[in-house]
Amino acid sequence: MANRLKEKYLKEVVPSLTEKFNYSSVMAVPKVDKIVLNMGVGDAVSNAKNLEKAAEELALISGQKPLITKAKKSIAGFRLREGVAIGAKVTLRGERMYEFLDKLVSVSLPRVRDFHGVPTKSFDGRGNYTLGVKEQLIFPEINFDDVDKTRGLDIVIVTTANTDEESRELLTGLGMPFAK
């Protein structure tokens, strides 16, 4: 069974993007390549339990086991040594990616307090979009009673679009609520 958002992409978004940007081939139409979820846990240096809890929450949100990220360099000011575990990340592709994007757009983002749309300035110039979430409680999988501390996470949506304009049209077509 194909995902609802993937069907919407194939039936509605591809024809509208082809019409707007005059693509010669269906393969030239931009698509979402992958979604990377990253949770930096700065206090993991002093308490390793915080990193375990963050990785557990990231696994619940994404439905996939996260990769523990380690410090590349030692930074004395942060009491950080090279090779110490300081975060967790997950890369979503295929069905899980579409499921997560659908859930993010239709369930999670509307649960944000005082939500007026996601900022339009978060494109990187190459057609990728980065979104910061201040607390993990907006995701329905996270049980409010089990949370010891609110943690934010970064969501990077990598697309095959060449420009920010194409990427924005793609994400708008998929239902991303951009601020007016």
Swiss-Prot record:
Going by the UniProt record, its keywords in alphabetical order are: Ribonucleoprotein, Ribosomal protein, RNA-binding, rRNA-binding, tRNA-binding
Q: Name one GO cellular component term.
A: ribonucleoprotein complex
The leader peptide range reads none
The Gene Ontology biological process annotation of the record reads: translation
GO MF annotation terms: rRNA binding; structural constituent of ribosome; tRNA binding
Matching PROSITE patterns: RIBOSOMAL_L5 (PS00358)
Stored InterPro entries:
Ribosomal_uL5 (IPR002132), Ribosomal_uL5_bac-type (IPR020930), Ribosomal_uL5_C (IPR031309), Ribosomal_uL5_CS (IPR020929), Ribosomal_uL5_dom_sf (IPR022803), Ribosomal_uL5_N (IPR031310)
Disulphide bonds annotated for this chain are none
Q: Which domain of life is it from?
A: Bacteria
How the protein assembles, per its UniProt entry? Part of the 50S ribosomal subunit; part of the 5S rRNA/L5/L18/L25 subcomplex. Contacts the 5S rRNA and the P site tRNA. Forms a bridge to the 30S subunit in the 70S ribosome.
Protein task: This is one of the proteins that bind and probably mediate the attachment of the 5S RNA into the large ribosomal subunit, where it forms part of the central protuberance. In the 70S ribosome it contacts protein S13 of the 30S subunit (bridge B1b), connecting the 2 subunits; this bridge is implicated in subunit movement. Contacts the P site tRNA; the 5S rRNA and some of its associated proteins might help stabilize positioning of ribosome-bound tRNAs.
Q: Which family does it belong to?
A: Belongs to the universal ribosomal protein uL5 family.
Q: What is this protein called?
A: Large ribosomal subunit protein uL5
In the record, what lineage is assigned to the organism producing the protein? Bacteria, Bacillati, Bacillota, Bacilli, Lactobacillales
